[in-house]
């Protein structure tokens, strides 16, 4: 009994730095942000600690509400395309032999060795009118005149896909790698076609990984304002851009905090939906 008690005491002491770190750098900033969202802005960068709901009411104004709608549209479009591209990559990556899996993981992680901003500036060279993409398309005879892709909505979607696609691939890969392929083989032996076996077995069992990838791509794509700034030419204003603008030029920290709180609530709701769906799937599997 004494040994068990000593072990539990030592474990508690070892976890103490983690608790302190979480409280100081996560809990306290969140409390401050939520409190700030109910404060009243004053001139300059000042804040008057007077309770108000105006910051949240302002979000419902057409100009700000439209920003949320546009951000949701962009996030939804980007996530669908990323899922359609990322799922097959993650699935086939899990089917590779062990020595090739490591090479594939290395190639997938390679872009993270370079800063995202630098990589996005590379896309400016590719997407501009005299860029590589238009050059290749014209040489192949697919187009006669160069396309105006840069500083447009499609350019932002391309940037989102480029930055966030690895997260989807790794999420699907981690889920597909744990899949017991004997279930698929059993379905095939019982007369199911490859397509039927995929939708009834593979897709259902890898759904948690797909949903995890959706969360890892949908939520950031609403706030990655630097992609919209670089590839979109400020034609699309995201929630992240709005928060940055209110924190700097707008000098309205309480309103920026309110926007951040709404984003945090949206993220929490998505995670709760994900957990509910995955738990339901696990219960179905047990049943």
State each model region's role:
Residues 45-50, 125, 225-251, 287:
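Glycine-rich helix-loop "coupling/hinge" segments at transmembrane-helix boundaries
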Residues 276-287:
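Short cytosolic juxtamembrane segments of multi-pass membrane proteins
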């Amino acid at each position: 009994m004494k040994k068990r008690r000593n072990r539990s005491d030592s474990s508690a002491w070892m976890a103490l730095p983690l608790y302190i770190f979480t409280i100081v750098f996560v809990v306290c900033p969140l409390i401050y942000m939520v409190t700030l969202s109910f404060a009243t802005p004053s001139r300059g960068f000042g804040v008057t600690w007077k309770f108000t709901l105006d910051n949240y009411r302002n979000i419902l104004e057409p100009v700000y509400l439209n920003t949320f709608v546009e951000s949701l549209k962009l996030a939804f479009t980007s996530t669908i395309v990323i899922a359609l591209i990322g799922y097959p990559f993650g699935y086939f990556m899990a089917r590779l032999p062990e020595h090739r899996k490591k090479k594939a993981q290395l190639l997938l992680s390679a872009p993270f060795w370079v800063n995202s901003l630098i990589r996005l500036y590379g896309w400016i060279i590719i997407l501009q009118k005299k860029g590589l993409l238009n050059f290749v398309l014209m040489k192949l005879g697919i187009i006669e005149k160069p396309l105006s892709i840069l500083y447009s909505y499609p350019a932002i979607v391309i940037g989102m896909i480029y930055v966030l696609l690895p997260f989807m691939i790794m999420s699907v890969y981690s889920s597909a790698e744990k899949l017991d392929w004997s279930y698929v083989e059993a379905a095939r032996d019982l007369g199911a076609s490859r397509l039927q076996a995929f939708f009834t077995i593979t897709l259902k069992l890898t759904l948690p990984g797909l949903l995890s990838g959706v969360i890892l791509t949908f939520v950031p794509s609403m706030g990655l304002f630097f992609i919209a700034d670089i590839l979109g030419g400020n034609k699309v204003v995201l929630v992240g851009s709005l928060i940055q603008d209110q924190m700097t030029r707008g000098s309205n920290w309480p309103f920026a905090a309110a926007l951040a709180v709404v984003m945090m609530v949206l993220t929490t709701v998505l995670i709760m939906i994900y957990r509910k769906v995955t738990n339901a799937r696990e219960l179905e599997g047990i049943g």
